[in-house]
Swiss-Prot record:
It catalyses: DNA(n) + a 2'-deoxyribonucleoside 5'-triphosphate = DNA(n+1) + diphosphate. Keywords: DNA replication, DNA-directed DNA polymerase, Nucleotidyltransferase, Transferase. This is DNA polymerase III subunit delta. The gene is holA. The keyword Nucleotide-binding does not apply. Residues 141-210 are annotated as: Domain 2. NCBIfam families: holA. Part of the beta sliding clamp loading complex, which hydrolyzes ATP to load the beta clamp onto primed DNA to form the DNA replication pre-initiation complex. DNA polymerase III is a complex, multichain enzyme responsible for most of the replicative synthesis in bacteria. This DNA polymerase also exhibits 3'-5' exonuclease activity. The delta subunit is the wrench that will open the beta subunit dimer, which has been modeled to leave a gap large enough for ssDNA to pass through. The DNA polymerase III holoenzyme complex contains at least 10 different subunits organized into 3 functionally essential subassemblies: the Pol III core, the beta sliding clamp processivity factor and the clamp-loading complex. The Pol III core (subunits alpha, epsilon and theta) contains the polymerase and the 3'-5' exonuclease proofreading activities. The polymerase is tethered to the template via the dimeric beta sliding clamp processivity factor. One of its GO terms (cellular component) is DNA polymerase III complex. It comes from Escherichia coli (strain K12).
Length: 343
């Protein structure tokens, strides 16, 4: 199976259409643009009919199979778009998809769109059956480290000259929100017809529309990035996130840190990570936090988190965003006012 990113898709399509395109990921912009690109190239090659089915327990699979088999001398070529359920295909859907793979032909182009599949879902028979004749396009929202490269490529597409400082501002303001980022670049191209995007020009035209989850906040805390952690917290507050969800998300990681710190005095970290089943991609930031924070600081963080939870239990309407900021600074190893630590 050919695996590529959305920015590589156009080049592959120009080489020749495959039997199926699997558009998988969580980013609405990348999914939609990839879908549009496949259908656009297919239309240029005579695929004039486009059919779309949302897959759920009530899907009429016989209608889909009939569509695949309805061939006549005058029938036009057609694309078939299947929208997978949010959690991906279950066993029953896998069976139907396997049947469908046996009905594909040169005048039918299959497009499957959905969230990223798990390893178990990728081992399903239908997925394996498509391996030699399909393209998988990874449509995940770029992480912080990959975002500047995406912005630079997008700017180049629009014939914009973007300096590094301007790129950083765009990433800061629109991380996790590619649709708003793409719209900002298009707006900037209209504002500045010469295509030169300097820092002052970009700062005049952007607004902070980054989108984060509580996990982004926790990751920033583990890495000791106080400025980023406070920015994420501000955006989560503006979006109406529930503080109790932030506290629960942090609590799990904080208690794990406390245990790891205590046990690391006599056991190697790698063995502890294995024992506590810490994912490989989280071990680096966990190690950073353990090296940076003392047992005293971790104990203070647990006390502050517990006190904040009690405040919410006693009065759910009470604002605890100041306490969450205090927690952020404490875990990023910044000096805290005594009011946070001593209560």
């Amino acid at each position: 199976m050919i695996r590529l990113y959305p920015e590589q898709l156009r080049a592959q399509l120009n080489e020749g259409l495959r039997a199926a395109y699997l558009l998988l990921g969580n980013d609405p912009l990348l999914l939609q643009e990839s879908q549009d690109a496949v259908r656009q190239v297919a239309a240029a090659q005579g695929f004039e009919e486009h059919h779309t089915f949302s897959i759920d327990p009530n899907t009429d699979w016989n209608a889909i199979f009939s569509l695949c088999q309805a061939m006549s001398l005058f029938a036009s070529r057609q694309t078939l778009l299947l929208l997978l359920p949010e959690n991906g295909p279950n066993a029953a859907i896998n069976e139907q998809l396997l049947t469908l793979t046996g009905l594909l032909h040169d005048d039918l182009l299959l497009i499957v769109r959905g969230n990223k599949l798990s390893k178990a879902q990728e081992n399903a028979a239908w997925f394996t059956a498509l391996a030699n004749r399909s393209v998988q396009v990874t449509c995940q929202t770029p992480e912080q480290a990959q975002l500047p490269r995406w912005v630079a490529a997008r700017a180049k597409q629009l014939n914009l000259e973007l300096d590094d400082a301007a790129n950083q501002v765009l990433c800061y303001c629109y991380e996790g929100n590619l649709l708003a980022l793409a719209q900002a670049l298009e707006r900037l191209s209209l504002l500045w017809p010469d295509g030169k995007l300097t820092l002052p020009r970009v700062e005049q035209a952007v607004n902070d529309a980054a989108h984060f989850t509580p996990f982004h906040w926790v990751d920033a805390l583990l890495m000791g990035k106080s400025k980023r952690a406070l920015h994420i917290l501000q955006q989560l507050r503006l979006e109406g996130s529930e503080p109790v969800i932030l506290l629960r998300t942090l609590q799990r990681e904080l208690l794990l840190l406390v245990n790891l710190k205590r046990q690391s005095a006599h056991t190697p970290l790698r063995a502890l990570f294995d024992k506590h089943r810490v994912w490989q991609n989280r071990r680096g930031m966990m190690g950073e936090a353990l090296n940076r924070l003392s047992q005293t600081q971790l104990r203070q963080a647990v006390q502050l988190l517990t006190r904040t939870e009690l405040t919410l239990k006693q009065d759910y309407g009470q604002s605890v965003w100041a306490e969450l900021e205090g927690l952020s600074l404490l875990l990023c190893h910044k000096p805290l006012a005594d009011v946070f630590i001593d209560g």
